Amino acid sequence: MITLDVIKSDGSSKTCTHLKKIIKDHSGKVLIALKLILALLTFFTITITINYIKVENNLQICQSKTESDKEDSPSNTTSVTTKTTLDHDITQYFKRLIQRYTDSVINKDTCWKISRNQCTNITTYKFLCFKPEDSKINSCDRLTDLCRNKSKSAAEAYHTVECHCIYTIEWKCYHHSID
């Protein structure tokens, strides 16, 4: 060993023997400690890199979906589809939601706009829009236009959940039937 040769030729035999013993006794432990530190640093570096790549991929997915929606939409708004049928549970949910946030009961045709967050699978109920009492509108499309244009004769109630990457918007309608 080069180190031992240097020590041997450098000093007295007593000092040399003592230093040889220290190096021999502790060199293995020091190397093991250095290897463990290197392994831990490698593990943390790989973990941080993997998490960074996941976040970057999610961000790119959100951005690409947002950009594709902007390209598909002529007026830089998200695409809108109108649905006229609802199952009973969803209708009941919206009736309760409207009642809670507006202190009113659905007794007329109603439309609401639903935004879906595809990145984290969150559904956001942007706002509810009610047909005016005196209106003769019977079509969901016409009612949707009225709500979308925020006519002064339509009342709005907002219920929003914070989320990111929203790119799908649907309108749903409930037609109140008079029994």
From Swiss-Prot:
Record-stated family: Belongs to the metapneumovirus small hydrophobic protein family.
GO CC annotations on file: host cell plasma membrane; membrane; virion membrane
Virion surface side: 51-179
Membrane topology label: Single-pass type II membrane protein
UniProt-annotated location(s): Virion membrane; Host cell membrane
Oligomeric and partner information: Homooligomer. Interacts with glycoprotein G.
Transmembrane segments: 30-50
Single GO biological process annotation from the record: proton transmembrane transport
Function, in words: Viroporin that forms a ion channel probably displaying low ion selectivity. Plays a role in counteracting host innate immunity by inhibiting TLR7/MyD88/TRAF6 signaling and STAT1 phosphorylation, leading to down-regulation of type-I IFN.
Ranges per topology, Intravirion: 1-29
Protein name (record): Small hydrophobic protein
Superkingdom of source: Viruses
Record keywords, A-Z: Glycoprotein, Host cell membrane, Host membrane, Hydrogen ion transport, Ion transport, Membrane, Phosphoprotein, Signal-anchor, Transmembrane, Transmembrane helix, Transport, Virion
Annotated glycosylation sites: N76, N121, N149
